[in-house]
């Protein structure tokens, strides 16, 4: 969608949504968070209506993150056949839109797992776009702090070692035509622009994965548009439907022109 490109940027989002919600009494804080969400939703979706749901999409997130730079998020879509794409929005992050994932014909859109950075106590919204163009959202509140400024490694050079290397893990048992699990791991520092180089004490310029495409054979599984809220060395769990021989191919690119691709042999499927 064309509306996505201008919003991927810390400065623009921060200008529109002026800072995280301050600590306050519960009712005041809830009202501030709802106001912030409405601003974000209006901007992201060009004033399209976003309806609440407890059935089309569900979000599983820790109430308190053990590591704010590596927060596991699981999205579940019980009515998966209706879902075209999902958006993951971390309301109080400097750039709230963490990822937009579009499901292709080789995907099973029942579940999606991501690791993200969370900068402060915040609502995390999951928005499902249905195939008829409607938007539905649900949210979870996560307590975390400092995830966007946490170092990606002991030094920038160390964090960039092996950049673009990929691994793919498949379920042990795969059957033709039935959903199968896969987990993609990509080495990349995903510099947020908010991290301080531990040696120079200067801020490291932003450099993050902005597009990833996963395909199986000649069909797309996932198209992923990302931003600074995806974690260092992103890990994504998803389901696909094996038909034919594959292989599974991943193409990834970042904001500094880096491009990587790799193909993976899928374990033989049984009938």
Segments from the language model and where they lie:
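Short edge beta-strand/loop segments characteristic of extracellular beta-sandwich folds
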Residues: 60, 71-79, 181-189, 197-202
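N-terminal edge beta-strand
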Residues: 40-70, 158-179
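Extracellular Ig-like/FN3 beta-sandwich strand-entry sites
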Residues: 119-123, 179, 243-247
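Aromatic sugar-binding surface patches on proteins
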Residues: 105-113, 228-237
């Amino acid at each position: 969608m064309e509306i996505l490109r201008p919003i991927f940027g810390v400065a623009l989002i921060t200008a529109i949504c002026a800072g995280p919600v301050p600590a306050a009494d519960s009712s005041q804080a809830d009202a501030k968070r709802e106001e912030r969400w409405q601003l974000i939703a209006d901007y992201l979706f060009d004033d399209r209506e976003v309806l609440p749901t407890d059935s089309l999409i569900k979000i599983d997130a820790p109430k308190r993150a053990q590591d704010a730079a590596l927060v596991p998020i699981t999205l579940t879509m019980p009515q998966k056949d209706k879902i075209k794409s999902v958006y993951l929005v971390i309301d109080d992050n400097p750039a709230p839109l963490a990822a937009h994932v579009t499901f292709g014909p080789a995907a099973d859109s029942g579940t999606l797992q991501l690791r993200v950075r969370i900068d402060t106590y915040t609502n995390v919204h999951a928005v499902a776009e249905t195939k008829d163009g409607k938007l539905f959202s649900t949210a979870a509140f996560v307590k975390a702090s400092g995830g966007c400024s946490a170092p990606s490694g002991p030094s920038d050079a160390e964090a960039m070692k092996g950049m673009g290397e990929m691994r793919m893990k498949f379920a042990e048992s795969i059957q033709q035509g039935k959903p199968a699990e896969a987990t993609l791991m990509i080495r990349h520092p995903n510099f947020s622009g908010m991290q301080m180089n531990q040696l120079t004490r200067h801020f490291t310029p932003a450099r993050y994965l902005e597009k990833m495409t996963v395909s199986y054979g000649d069909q797309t599984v996932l198209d992923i548009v990302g931003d600074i809220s995806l974690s260092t060395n992103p890990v994504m769990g998803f389901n696909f439907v094996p038909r034919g021989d594959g292989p599974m191919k991943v193409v990834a690119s970042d904001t500094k022109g880096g491009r990587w691709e790799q193909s993976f042999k899928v374990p033989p499927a049984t009938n």
